[in-house]
Amino acid sequence: MPKTPNVPGTDRPAEKAAGHWLLAQLGKKVLRPGGRETTNWLLSRALGGQIDVVEFAPGLGITALEIVKRSPKTYTGVDLDPKAAEIVRGRIGDNPNYTVVNAGAQETGLPDSSYDVVVGEAMLTMQTDKHKLEIMREAARILR
């Protein structure tokens, strides 16, 4: 398989790569159930005013860029993959209120009751039922 530059997981053989990174290597860089239109519709209703937003598993930062264009008070991306976290940092620009942490969505290390909105586009579908529950509990913990 040809390697796509700047895509995490390119150091692993296809049979060992995470499904979303394998799709990214093949050119499918955004996983959006419902498509871009649905994502934009949801973001336009969820993101308004001075709110604090956390995004679980921002991947290559495509949705992160859409979020920061809406000027939230803060944006925090949480990605387990260090290369993905670095890519998202590059996309969101140099704003002290916009950060990316290298952590898992089930244990972010973020403070309790500190965010207004959690975004996690298509990331739960790739998790076991146990991990889905852990991620949802973490989201509930960090939401106000």
Write out the residue ranges for each language-model feature.
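Class I SAM-dependent methyltransferase SAM/SAH-binding core
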Residues: 54, 60-107
